[in-house]
Each structure stands twice: as structure tokens, then as C-alpha cells.
């Protein structure tokens, strides 16, 4: 089934000039880029995006990290895009990352793991709508 999912290239990766390399890797692995933008999130935007995590121990450090440098948001499309992109991203925990995954290749640590991806089709729809209007997705 053809799906769309949201990808974020996080501040640790944009700061190290890895945007092109990561986007190319996504495309080489069967994910088409249907929308793309670079932005510097505000605290309010970040808190809104991660609202489901408000009150958790990692919330404030996550917000601070995500506003520290620009990010890139992209709509990816492909066969089972949500699941396939999550497999391509790799595990959040550094010790569980497998060779060939974006986080193994480019992640620096637990939070500084280069990329974000929607965890379900429902999340993908919500997250895509958070950053893109329908007319921005081709």
C-alpha cells in the first residue's frame, strides 16, 4: 500500500551538513520526496508538535534540542512508507542500531539521532498536516 510519512532531519544532522546525504539515502531506498522545507522551529511550534510528551522527563531537553538549529521536514511516499522509513531510520537506542540504518550511520547519541519518523499512519497524517498544507505536497 502506498503511504506517506513525515521525516525530520534533526538539528544534530543539519549542523553537520548531512541534509543532502540523508535525503539521497531516503530516495535510494525507495522513498520519494513529495514535500520539503527547512525551518528553524520556535519553542511554541516544538511544544505543539511534541504535545503528547508534555510532562515527561525528556520533554524540556527535547524541545531545547529541536530549537537549537534548523531542521528539515519532508513528506516521504512509498510502499508501506511508515514502516519502511522506520526500518531505514533504525533504533532510537544507540546500542540497538543496525548497519545500514540512518541512525547507525549519522546518529551521535540517544537524542542526537539525526532523524525522526512518524510511528503510525495516524501519526503520519497528523504530523504532515502540522508542517504542510495539501497544496505544498506534490
UniProtKB/Swiss-Prot annotation:
It is found in: Cytoplasm. Its EC number is 2.7.4.6. It is an enzyme of class 2 (transferase). This is Nucleoside diphosphate kinase. GO terms for cellular component: cytoplasm. Homotetramer. Its cofactor is Mg(2+). Its main location: cytoplasm. Keywords: ATP-binding, Cytoplasm, Kinase, Magnesium, Metal-binding, Nucleotide metabolism, Nucleotide-binding, Phosphoprotein, Transferase. Pfam families: NDK. The gene is ndk. It catalyses: a 2'-deoxyribonucleoside 5'-diphosphate + ATP = a 2'-deoxyribonucleoside 5'-triphosphate + ADP; a ribonucleoside 5'-diphosphate + ATP = a ribonucleoside 5'-triphosphate + ADP. The active site is at 116 (pros-phosphohistidine intermediate). GO terms for biological process: CTP biosynthetic process; GTP biosynthetic process; UTP biosynthetic process. One of its GO terms (molecular function) is metal ion binding. ATP binds at residues 10, 58, 86, 92, 103, 113. PROSITE patterns: NDPK, NDPK_LIKE. Major role in the synthesis of nucleoside triphosphates other than ATP. The ATP gamma phosphate is transferred to the NDP beta phosphate via a ping-pong mechanism, using a phosphorylated active-site intermediate. It comes from Glaesserella parasuis serovar 5 (strain SH0165) (Haemophilus parasuis). Belongs to the NDK family. The keyword Coiled coil does not apply. The keyword Signal does not apply.
